[in-house]
Amino acid sequence: MEKKYVLSIDQGTTSSRAIIFDKAGQIQKVTQKEFTQIFPNPGWVEHDAMEIWSSVQSVVAEALADVPAAEIAAIGITNQRETTVVWDKNTGKPVYNAIVWQSRQTMDICNELKEKGLDPIVREKTGLLIDAYFSGTKVKWILDNVEGAREKAEAGDLLFGTIDTWLVWKLTGGAVHVTDYTNASRTLMYNIHELKWDEEILEALTVPASMLPEVKPSSEVYGNTHKDKFQGMEIPISGMAGDQQAALFGQACFEEGMAKNTYGTGCFMLMNTGEKAVPSKNGLLTTIAWGVDGKVEYALEGSIFVAGSAVQWLRDGMRMFRDAKDSELYATRVQSSEGVYMVPAFVGLGAPYWDSEVRGAMFGLTRGTTKEHFVRATLESLCYQTKDVLSAMEADSGIELAKLRVDGGAVANDLLLQIQSDFLGVPVERPMCIETTALGAAYLAGLAVGFWADKNDIKKNFGIDREFDPKMEETEAAKLYEGWQKAVEATMAFK
């Protein structure tokens, strides 16, 4: 039977999805299933890794109800990054819940490592900061806090993996224990320059090397599905990348200096820096973009904590409208925010500030300020924060941004993208397919089996739904941005 499709498994923070793509990069089928969020203590976030596996089996079975498995050329996996699973390799069962990227339960471990002066070493070797966000301290926490776990780990009976690793292990019936360069680069344990697990950091974290998966390129046949899992078929699993890197690949940002921004609950921006790992002096992370065609390419990354969730706050907390889509309607009723600035630091500020203690603020209110000004100022705050991060990227890389590609739920808002283009002074491109994360995983998988010939073949599929060009005078944009910088400074001073 002709191989017509590639199946993407998109394992996210709140749901698992299966998406089937054809050769033109068009979606043929989407299935989705949510799973339980577990909050054992304030600031802790966990998932049941067996429930995640069950949700993946469910969405895959549903997707293959209409498309014969025999027509699937390959499977690609993209995943919530950093989320940590530790399981017994003999029973196949996790020894503890998966500790999610958002979870802060390892803050004490992070503080101990910082007190030992390890921050500069970790920064130089991994491109990351010592933070509870990343996997390394989560593995240590499980070994230190789950009865018998450390003994089992030292006996070689426990395995660690981020979600990609866990899913491949399950899909292959326990035959394959691998991760890819992108996911390894988010663990806090991987040397992104030497491309190996770092012994010095493993020793500091007291994590046995025997637990760790083999690190492979992002596009390679890792193994086949166990025939019991896929309608009796053995299908190659041949692409893997963390969600943000997969989106960069799905947006065809293959050249140095190309960047994408994902507007979700928060924002994630990545800029391709080519075969050079650029160290950041401006509060960004240095990470691996992908390993494809026998070479590793790098990216600068900036995370904004609050973006779409600020619009949700206007809807749910302030009751300003019933549907998030109405934010565009209200914001277009005024020509500007009339000097009103909103700094949405509800959970602190991410890149490039990294201040977890600061809280949100509004500035410039008068008797003439209306709900419409509030809403517009909130949308503008997403765009100002994006400019903050992209300015840091330009300063670190020495590359001037030529255009920005965008994806995520909020990009349906035309006004938001026009404001973004105005503030950046460059075109903003919204692609035809906004499922860029799943598409990136599909492309990586398809490349490995020859479903797509090369990156040029993929580029041909990339279509722009709409391009937003700057309409605002540069002097006006600069003046508004200066006001934003003052607002952030004042917000950070108020604690």
Curated annotation (Swiss-Prot):
Annotated keywords:
ATP-binding, Glycerol metabolism, Kinase, Nucleotide-binding, Transferase
Q: Where does glycerol bind?
A: 81-82, 133, 243-244
Name its pathway: Polyol metabolism; glycerol degradation via glycerol kinase pathway; sn-glycerol 3-phosphate from glycerol: step 1/1
Q: What InterPro entries does this protein map onto?
A: ATPase_NBD, Carb_kinase_FGGY, Carb_kinase_FGGY_CS, FGGY_C, FGGY_N, Glycerol_kin
GO-annotated molecular function: ATP binding; glycerol kinase activity
Q: Catalysed reaction per UniProt?
A: glycerol + ATP = sn-glycerol 3-phosphate + ADP + H(+)
PANTHER family from the UniProt entry: GLYCEROL KINASE, SUGAR KINASE
List the protein's name. Glycerol kinase
Q: From which source organism is this entry?
A: Maridesulfovibrio salexigens (strain ATCC 14822 / DSM 2638 / NCIMB 8403 / VKM B-1763) (Desulfovibrio salexigens)
Gene name linked to the record: glpK
